Amino acid sequence: SAARSEFKSLDVFYFHNCLYEFVWTENKRRWSERTPTHDVLRTFGPDHKVIFVGDASMSPYEILMPGGGVEHFNDEAGSVWLKRVLERFAHVLWINPVPEGRWGWTPSIDLISQHFEGRMVPLTLEGLDEGMRLLLK
């Protein structure tokens, strides 16, 4: 992909809605070949840059509550996992494809944005430019 030519190293992991205890590298194998999120946190050093890409649109319970996940029972709230990522890595960004003018219509977007403390940008040329500046701070 074009992204692989722009980054020295690029590892891609998937999750559904909110980050929980497992991620996967291929969506078709999401139930059979999962990677513990703790392993990802231990594998990559704090100097790595982390970019989330997603609409952040979900039930607020998925972020705030244990057991709020829609596909499995999560023992810890998604916010706990987001906090772990934000504490481990200094340079974290969330790129959101939902037009920024619509973010206020979805409470979960606001919750994720609060966790990311201003490090959520829209998937626009201007947003990507701002996101890259944020990652380099």
Show where each model-derived region lies:
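Acidic, low-complexity intrinsically disordered regions
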Residues: 1-137
